[in-house]
Amino acid sequence: MTRSLGDLARGRGDDADDFDDFDDFEEEISTKPKARATTRRSTRASTEDVYEEDGTDSPPRTSSWGRAGTFMDEHADGIALTLVGIAIVLGAAVWLGVGGPVGTFIADIVHLTIGAGAWVLPVALIAAAVALMLNYTPDPQSRTRVGIGGSIILLCMLGLIHLFAGNPAEWAGRKNAGGAIGAWVGTPLELGFSVYLAVPILFLILFYGALKTTGITIREFGGFVTGFFGFGAGAEDDDEEGDDLYGHVDREIETRASGRALPAAEPRPTRVTPRRTTSSTPRRAAASLDRYPADEPGTPPGPPPSVAPTGSRERKQTEASTSIEPALFPEPERRKPSVSETDEFPAVKAPETPAAEAPAPAKDSARDAVAASRENLRQAMIQRSGMDPQGPPKEEPEDNPGVVVSDGDSTYVLPSADLLIPGAPAKTHSETNDRIIEAITDVFREFNVDAAVTGFSRGPTVTRYEIELGPGVKVSKITNLQSNIAYAVATENVRLLTPIPGKSAVGIEVPNADREMVRLGDVLNAPATVDNLDPMLVGLGKDIEGDFVSYSVQKMPHLLVAGSTGSGKSAFVNSLLVSLLTRATPEEVRLILVDPKMVELTPYEGIPHLITPIITQPKKAAAALQWLVEEMEQRYMDMKQTRVRHIKDFNRKIKSGEIETPLGSKREYRAYPYIICVVDELADLMMTAPKEIEESIVRITQKARAAGIHLVLATQRPSVDVVTGLIKTNVPSRLAFATSSLTDSRVILDQGGAEKLIGMGDALFIPQGAGKPQRIQGAFVTDEEIQAVVEAAKVQAEPDYTDGVTEDKGGDSKKIDADIGDDLDDLLEAVELVVTSQIGSTSMLQRKLRIGFAKAGRLMDLMETRGVVGPSEGSKAREVLVKPEELDTILWMLKGADPADAPKEEQWGDDGYAEPVGEGPGDGSDDSSSSDGTTVVRANPAGGVF
């Protein structure tokens, strides 16, 4: 609807459609030149409007295209669903080859008709169905034009495919080319001309079909190309105001709001803008705003504008302005006015007339209509922007300087890093550095090595001296002098780095005589650490160049820490835990602490981040690791059901409300916190239950990264029986403190270097994906600092322990078959190997498990009796009857446990309701019902609450 602002100001309430017209005007003002989606009523509405305004009795003529459009409008959904069904059948038959006899027959017909076009036909049908579902029905003229242009494009494309395929004469070749249609188009052109002329001719016709489909000319296409590549950017900016259909209304509103007089009316160039009617009510002729004076007290309203009779000429213009299809190249999008910009235009209040000067009844009705119109406008602005233009401005919220994390009803204040003691300023140079430079230079001079010290980087523990070699000098000459350099600088802990990463120089690392202590407070208060909002970022220390080093546990994602007694391993564990307490809330990160020594992690007892009290017994530690495995499996099942790949995406969807409980399910989804399990001494656990501990660690480190579960394994005895090959393979990040031998260094780092460290926090750190270790000085935190941070966390919340974490779930109902005997561990390994590789070979078991032929044959017989593999087929490998996704269930059964206790996932039943996999109706084992009837299902059978 097009109605002038003067009509609104005069309150023209002569019929019931005035306020509907006002709503349309308000919508058009707010959405200015944006193209709107056309409804199925638009074409018929514009035709009916013209018919009513014309006043004639003859109904509008309807063409065959119009009748077809009416039929499509009435049956759009049915046609769309039919197209979707055809597309599914074609896609299954053409793409996947699973269409069955009927689908294959249909696919053959389509291939014979359009050849390679059958591959894209399902996509085209889906696009047409979506267009029908979105109510996109062009006017009859556009249908004719698009139909002709699309047919031309289709014929040309099939002809080109036929020619590019070499003009096959056999139908088998035409099925993969352009089909019968492509041969019908391409073969005559090639016979009449040649392939070198037929291809350009088809491209020209194809270009004409594109112009026909889009409805533009070549000149308009050239203008679009120049504008697209930036040649017409200036002209487009200059004409921005002219493109705005309602720009003059905005200027008049600003003029009236400021109280200035309106300027003289200027002729406005006519511009036909492709717009569609959004209302079926008849449109009135627009009256210029300049014909009405400003609203001032005592000013009588002017006469209403006269509406010229609508003749055939104006009817045609109305049809042209309301029924033109949307523009092919839309105008540049303009941003909507913000709330602050909207508030700059105060609403014009109706003037108050004293009782002595009561206007005539006509004036009263007009002012009532004006007041109603303005009130509607104000309500619309409140609804759109959320602010009242006539109301008082909202107060700005005050900034809260504290670090407060709010989650629902609980508000947790992170302990401040200011509780930690800051360190002394770092030194950059000392007399010792000059003396060592002279000593290294003398060694090079004595052995006639063309090399020189070009610089050094002083760290808190060691200083790295950069050696630049002369032309033709081998690096091996420097490495062969390692013992002589150590003798010259009077220390045995000299480490050579060949070369320094990122530099063309050899590094010689010499310990500092005056070591510096790195405080954890300095690391956590470093700008790079403060700017990083990752709650799992931990402070490691300071590198050899004097920069603070921090790293996220999520990126590790599992860490192996090793070092001899007094090397700084326990200090690092304390730094890690204090870092987590100062950066993460209990809702974000939960902890499982395993302390076989019973004294290292005692200060952290009672913090709200704990899932279970600090574990000191190895048997309970093994049960806790098994609980982590079950928790990991349950999380993966939930992520599978919600179709996410990482716990971050799952929590984001939970908080935004995108994940809803399936119909009929009693499960209540909650956001999962990250879980970090810290084992202070792995050697004690491996001595007690090595098989169970290793199996749980391997499963967690292999799969738990995306589930938000991370392991930090520390040991002071990095031998091969503690840090096994499977554990090393699946723990990518390593932190090595000083070790007692080169063998231990190779176990933890797969290379030497840790035996050269000087202890007391000196470490080599290899994060995931790094090629060479980075030497750092670990951060130190005192017992008083630990106590202060722990108390700040404990006073805010009590620990919410989870039941069943440390319960031994293996000795209750396990009944191992008698024929298995003591071979259960070997049988489990054999089953996992066979099911994973899908090869049932006895010789493979011999090689992989390093067992004899007799035992391998016995294991194969045991697997045959339990349905894992089929019977023997002579020299051929046996058939594997268990799929890889069924491995966990078969292992669970072989251990003698009840299969019903295995982790379950929910799937959709036949009746449309969610049912747990493997449970019958009415089987609800661990459900707990609340007073309001809501049943919360625990996340895993061990009793986890996440």
Swiss-Prot record:
Spans within the Cytoplasmic topological domain: 212-946
Superkingdom in the source lineage: Bacteria
Positions of transmembrane segments: 78-98, 114-134, 146-166, 191-211
Residues that bind ATP: 566-571
Amino acid composition bias (Low complexity), ranges on this chain: 263-288, 347-363, 927-936
Any one Gene Ontology cellular component term annotated for this protein: plasma membrane
GO MF, one annotated term: DNA binding
Stretches assigned to the FtsK domain: 533-746
Subcellular location: Cell membrane
SMART domains tied to this protein: Ftsk_gamma
Job of this protein: Essential cell division protein that coordinates cell division and chromosome segregation. The N-terminus is involved in assembly of the cell-division machinery. The C-terminus functions as a DNA motor that moves dsDNA in an ATP-dependent manner towards the dif recombination site, which is located within the replication terminus region. Required for activation of the Xer recombinase, allowing activation of chromosome unlinking by recombination.
Name of the protein: DNA translocase FtsK
Organism: Corynebacterium efficiens (strain DSM 44549 / YS-314 / AJ 12310 / JCM 11189 / NBRC 100395)
